[in-house]
From Swiss-Prot:
The gene is atpA. The keyword Ribosomal protein does not apply. It catalyses: ATP + H2O + 4 H(+)(in) = ADP + phosphate + 5 H(+)(out). Component of the A-type ATP synthase that produces ATP from ADP in the presence of a proton gradient across the membrane. The A chain is the catalytic subunit. It is a peripheral membrane protein. It holds the Pfam family ATP-synt_ab. This is A-type ATP synthase subunit A. One of its GO terms (biological process) is proton motive force-driven plasma membrane ATP synthesis.
Length: 586
């Protein structure tokens, strides 16, 4: 192994000499305490190292030892329900081992417990041919998720021996004989370099929407399975609650939640809340299918980059089993700030607003690892990783580099608006600024699962909301009574859309999740009201009378009505009442 000594220290960046033979992105142990670091630059025999722990107290002359391996994630049973820091050190295990409320420097605890035993049930037999990605057995990791044990990358051949029973993650469970007669032992744990995307057979088109149960996100700005989305918004606009809602209700099997440089108390909220939340899909706890990566703002900045790559590697591992994974990163801006700080320490040429010139390529490397794929292996498995990245632009300025570079990469943009949040309109996603480029891809799915006219109704409702925004400027100057009758109807129906459809109560048992069919029926009902109201106005009805009809109260009750009762009883009754009351005005 390469061994050198420290010549310079600048915050999280350390320079060591005598490092000839070291490799880029190799993990090294820095100083007498053996702090974890990663080589990010090599020049002759000097190595520039970013250190993932606090460097205070280290002095020039202390040793630097190479490990010969890149920064890698340990992947295997025991990750679900776990809480890691940015470099996949298990926080609960560190607390148990050190009895400290802080992470001591240089502490080394395996990411996955070597003592815990897991019940392994084989799904292949001796003599079966296997290749990388094939599932050879299962482990019931939690009540919600069955962990599938796969053949590691680079191994293929014939099963010579396979066991059944309780094993630790490092005990051999099978032996594979390769084509050249070599015998390879298979254990339940794999290691994978976090900067390298895991392989797959092919990427599949994003044709199926990720149903989140949130009306605004699903109906107007849908995210496809395997897609990437950004949630930019200023402080207090509801980024974290929006991400919690997605984690709770999305039709993904597994959630990886990365708290990247966020406040400690926000991460504490997640850690306290998630273990108590019930997962209505499985009936178990939400934590049973969640991996938490807590990397708060007071932890060393270099670890923010590692936390993002560690999170996406864990997500890809579960994707390779054929699961759907939702990865939420809160917030990518803090990672970009860490890049800016380290770039400054390296004395690199700054780009826009001091961020490094490679900001956009690093963001792209991360977001491009999302996707719906045909997984490796003989069996026809499909899995997906969806990325939802929160962005925290200073002062809510969407033109700043992190937001603008993110928007070039992702196809869904949910713009949070502080003004909507102040008016208590939640989710505070601004429907005039947001967009989704997946609409054409997921349109067929919506038509098959709701109705043929889904797209027309959705587009018509969107046009009304845009017209309302144009009319609001006139209304503020001269009042609504000066508008033509049809435009007064547009204002009234747009208000119904905003209050009775777009607003959603995250704390209501009924309204917290809204199925695609209920979403379509609610929107169709409001648009039926609009078309009947326009006809009534053309026949001479007064818009003031239309605004007073009692059926509007029934429309307001739609979201708080259980789905079955709404679809079978309330919706047909409302449509009938709309015709009756509006016809009576003519």
């Amino acid at each position: 192994m390469v061994s050198g000594k420290i010549v310079k220290i600048a915050g999280p960046v350390v320079v060591a000499e005598g490092m000839k033979g070291a490799q880029m992105y190799e993990v090294v142990k820095v100083g007498n305490e053996g702090l974890t670091g990663e080589i990010i630059q090599l020049e002759s025999d000097k190595a520039v190292i970013q250190v993932y722990e606090e460097t205070a107290g280290i002095v020039p002359g202390e040793p630097v030892e190479g490990t010969g391996a890149p920064l890698s994630a340990e992947l295997g049973p025991g990750m679900l329900k776990a809480m890691y820091d940015g470099i996949q050190r298990p926080l609960t295990a560190i607390e148990d081992a050190t009895k400290s409320i802080y992470i001591p420097r240089g502490v080394s605890v395996p990411s996955i417990s070597r003592e815990a035993k897991w019940d392994f049930t084989p799904t292949v037999n001796v003599g079966d041919k296997v290749e990388a990605g094939d599932i050879i057995g299962t482990v019931p990791e939690t009540k919600s998720i069955v962990h599938k044990i796969m053949i590691p990358n680079g191994i293929s051949g014939t099963i010579k021996e396979i066991k059944s029973g309780s094993f630790t993650v490092v005990e051999p469970i099978a032996i594979v004989e390769t084509e050249n007669g070599e015998e390879k032992e298979i254990i339940m744990m794999q290691k994978w370099p976090v900067r390298n995307p895991r392989p797959y057979k092919e990427k599949l088109p994003p044709e199926i929407p990720l149903v989140t149960g949130q009306r605004l996100e699903d109906t107007f700005f849908g995210l496809a399975k395997g897609g990437a989305s950004a949630i930019p918004g200023p402080f207090g606009s509801g980024k974290t609650v929006t991400q919690h809602q997605l984690a709770k209700w999305s039709d993904a099997d597994i959630v990886v939640y990365i708290g990247c440089g966020e406040r400690g108390n926000e991460m504490t909220e997640v850690i306290e809340e998630f273990p108590h939340l019930d997962d209505l899909k499985t009936g178990n706890k939400l934590m049973d299918r969640t991996v938490l990566i807590a990397n708060t703002s007071n932890m060393p900045v270099a670890a923010r980059e590692a936390s993002v790559y560690t999170g996406i590697t864990i997500a890809e591992y579960f994707r390779d089993m054929g699961y759907g994974v939702l990865l939420t990163a809160d917030s990518t801006s803090r990672w970009a700030e860490a890049m800016r700080e380290i770039s400054g320490r390296l004395e690199e040429m700054p780009g826009e607003e001091g961020y490094p010139a490679y900001l956009s390529s690093r963001l792209a490397q991360f977001y491009e690892r999302a996707g719906r794929v045909a997984c490796m292996g003989h069996d026809e498995k499909q899995g997906f990783v969806c990325i939802v990245g929160a962005v925290s632009p200073p002062g809510g300025d969407f033109s700043e580099p992190v937001t603008s570079n993110t928007l070039r990469i992702v196809k869904v943009f949910w713009a949070l608006d502080a003004n909507l949040a102040r008016r208590r309109h939640f989710p505070a996603i601004n429907w005039l600024q947001s967009y989704s480029l997946y609409l054409d891809d997921i349109e067929d799915w919506w038509k098959e699962n709701t109705a043929e006219d889904w797209r027309e109704i959705r587009d018509e409702a969107m046009n009304l909301l845009q017209k309302e925004a144009e009319l609001q400027e006139i209304v503020q100057l001269v009042g609504p009574d000066a508008l033509p009758d049809k435009e007064r109807v547009i204002l009234e129906v747009s208000r119904m859309l905003r209050e009775d459809f777009l607003q959603q109560d995250a704390f209501s048992d009924i309204d917290s999740y809204c199925s695609p069919m209920k979403q379509y029926t609610m929107l169709k009902t409001i648009m039926t009201f609009y078309s009947k109201a326009i006809l009534a106005v053309e026949k001479g009805a007064d818009p003031a009378d239309i605004a007073k009809v009692s059926v509007k109260q029934d429309v307001a009750k739609m979201k708080y009505t259980p789905e079955e009762e709404f679809l079978n009883k309330l919706a047909p009754a409302i449509v009938e009442k709309i015709s009756k009351e509006l016809d009576a005005l003519v």
